Amino acid sequence: MIIFQRAKDTEARHNKQPYDIMDFKKRLFVGLLFTLTAALTVTAAPRSKAAIKAIAAKVFKQSPTLMTTRASKDEPRALLANKAFTVMGYDNGGFVIVSNDDLLPDVIAYSNTVFDKNTNNENFKWYLSAAEEAIKDIVKSGKPRTMVPPDQSKYAAEIPSFLTARWGQEKPYNDLCPEGTTSGTGSWQGYGSTGRTLTGCVATAMAQILYYIGWPEHGIGTHSVNVKQADGSKKKLTVNYEESVYDWGNMIDSYRGHYSKEQGEAVARLMLDCGVAADMNYATDGSGTFTENACQGLKRNFGFPETIQMLKRRRYTEKAWMDIVYNELNERRAILYTGVDLKNGGHAFVICGYDEAGKVWVNWGWEGSADGFYDIALLNPRSMKFSDDQDMIIGLEGEKAELVQDTVTVETPGTLDTLIADSTKSMISLLKVNGKINSSDLRTIRQIAGNNADGTIQRSSLATLDLSDAVIVSGGEPYIVDGKRELTTKDNEIPERAFFNCRSIRNL
């Protein structure tokens, strides 16, 4: 987590002055008038349980993000409820956060992941806590809140998530992190007091963005941090970035299953270098740093230009802030976003997409846990004390890799995969396919478009797909495996789900 310095509380000073009985009556009348006026303006109407359930069911039915999670025919049930919102979903995955009052938009967030009310995902817990406070504050004020959707005269109506990594802070990500001890600020994450330190959520966010960019090939210069030891001493750790070669080809989207030694070492090297560049305060119970340090480290050790910026939320109106967010995401630039928790410090995560309503896709940096669309603008620091330190780093793009435009003619159905080199699949921006193609070929096209048959996501540059001179035929391996369902092609028919969740394709 990020460690923020907290300002000391100050007491307001009140000068008591005498007043006469008429002044008292005036004050009393004004006070009563204000109370009555306030009571009249509060028109909050709590949503019934039936209404909340209906809202969630509608989202599950209509949202592409949640369609694949509806394995059960049962209605979603309440997984968590408080005075501000209700989390509706399924035990096997998929949840919707519904506001309990109609002063707010009905849906606060939704995700296709499993909701765990006892999660140790500190970033997600921060959002739940902050959203609860924000909703209570809005209901208390009696002023309705509307979202700021993307201006479709300037931006795309929606940008599907384009970040494919689902990384975390423990093994193998922290395999090269230094040995250390606890931070001394609490052991809320429950890890041991001595041993291997965690990467820190700032480093994980940085690393996921660099992996998405696939740049640079190596770092610049050297940098050092001091790591606290169990005996109270500090041990200096130095990284020579000139010797760090980033093995992008051996990094994978998820390390939750099997991975090779080389794949583990590749991501561990990147994580360490990100942490040191950001002046990480390494600890076994939570490593932290400031957003400013991450921004400077990206410039100093990774070669990012001076044009990258760290912006503070409290300096912008909600509309202006979200306009910056939409602009970055339209340019396919991931945003490193941070928010403060007055109890547990700060939290860093990645924003990498948005829906038509203006909810942004959040990658919490917890191996995919709770990733989904969230109303981040709800947390307005101009009216809520808790979010005074929301920041974001924008302008994060590296040197563009040379993309490929390819035309392939399939002579024998099912052979498309053999006609395109694996090393170029992620770099194809325009693909034209001629000839007869079957289900196996469609499976390959979906893979190039960033979506494997089992639904896992991988890096993709494919923006334009041309099948105008292709003929769909039956046969081949299934192009989608959804539970027990295996979808295959039929003659002269493009299946409805042929390109479902192929997030990179913009022209077909």
Q: What annotation goes with each model-predicted range?
A:
Residues 104-287:
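Active-site-adjacent structural segments surrounding the nucleophilic cysteine of cysteine proteases
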Residues 20-30:
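Bacterial N-terminal signal peptides that target proteins for export
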Residues 70-92, 296, 300-363:
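Active-site-adjacent substructure of cysteine-protease-like catalytic cores
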Residues 498-499:
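Hydrophobic anchor residues at the C-terminal helix/turn of individual leucine-rich repeat
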Residues 406-410, 430-436, 460-492, 502-508:
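Structural signature of tandem-repeat unit edges
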Residues 40-44:
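Sec/Tat signal peptide C-region and signal peptidase I cleavage site
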Residues 31-39:
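Bacterial N-terminal signal peptides
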Residues 45-81, 96, 102-172, 176-177, ...:
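Cys-His-centered catalytic/binding microenvironment captured across papain-like cysteine peptidases
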